Curated annotation (Swiss-Prot), chains A, B:
Protein name as it appears in the record: CASP-like protein 5A1
Keyword Transmembrane helix recorded: yes
Membrane topology: Multi-pass membrane protein
Transmembrane regions: 36-56, 68-88, 103-123, 153-173
Location within or outside the cell: Cell membrane
Endpoints of the signal sequence: none
Chief location of this protein within or outside the cell: membrane
Keywords: Cell membrane, Membrane, Transmembrane, Transmembrane helix
Entry similarity comment: Belongs to the Casparian strip membrane proteins (CASP) family.
Length: 176, 176
């Protein structure tokens, strides 16, 4: 270069499509942690579990049947878990933060799997006993069959909303 | 080259580590379709479901309780499904063929999910009624409590062996 003849030659900027080595990464499906669909699922789980718990508690003799006591315990656990996850989802949405940490997602999968299994087991046991009382023994005149049925149905609905959460989070963990 | 002076010079073969553009692909975990572990899981599911079915059928009054009839139906379905999958796994092992077709894996996931849910629901309903008869009403002297308990436990064990099949196949589908 000739120092006595300095010149600034305008040069084109290099193309900036560097992309930072794009990883193949799945998009956010609604219902995954940290999405609006996920928050809606959590709130649905919580509401159905609260209704199931309240209805079962409003019968005075639920404690004489082990399965109904178990339903109350399982719905309490489901309420606490879904409420905690709803708060986390709401926070993630507010601060626009993605919940994609491997450890966090694993924790969600295990928690969802355990609570879904417990809630479903409680709902099935209660359904078996409700059908036994109502259809097989025909003793609905001495028992709160309607309330038992409604509480069982609400527990099933709560499980029905935990399952997509579990499957989508498991999918997210597997497809990382 | 001088044609009057032919010579064969031994040359080194080029390195053959061409790798054929290695795709990122998960390895075969034992328990997935087409593995020896998968075949063992299928045979376990089948055996436990057959034992649960046989024990429940050996009680003469199972048909008076809806949940016990449902257990019989669910274990029959589980037997058929697990036997079919065991045959497919055995065939895949014999001809050393990998079961990695997307459609086939999806079918396995749906079938495993449905049969696992049905078997678990039947086991939970039977468990609820068995506990009701044995612990809450204390009428084991008039009922086959031991047989009910054993059949329920076998159904739970069958479900316990379907779950890893379902989770591993779902993992395989998600991580493709």
């Amino acid at each position: 270069m000739n120092p006595s003849h300095p010149a600034v030659h305008p040069v084109e900027a290099p193309p900036t499509d560097v992309h930072h080595a794009p990883r193949v990464r799945m998009k956010d499906y609604q219902g995954m942690p940290g999405t609006l669909g996920g928050l809606a699922l959590r709130l649905g789980q919580f509401c159905f579990a609260v209704v199931a718990f309240s209805i079962m508690l409003s019968t005075d003799d639920f404690s004489t049947v082990t399965a109904f006591c178990y339903l109350v315990a399982a719905t309490v656990l489901q309420c606490l878990w879904s409420l905690a996850l709803a708060v986390i989802d709401g926070y993630a949405l507010l601060v626009k933060r993605s919940l994609r940490n491997s450890l966090v997602v694993s924790l969600f999968v295990v928690g969802d799997g355990v609570t879904a299994t417990l809630t479903f087991a409680a709902a099935c046991a209660s359904a078996g006993i409700t059908v036994l009382i109502g259809n097989d023994l025909r003793e609905c005149d001495q028992n709160h069959c309607g309330k038992y049925e409604t509480a069982t149905a609400m527990a099933f609905l709560s499980w029905f909303m935990v399952s997509p959460s579990f499957l989508l989070t498991f999918w997210l963990l597997a497809s990382r």
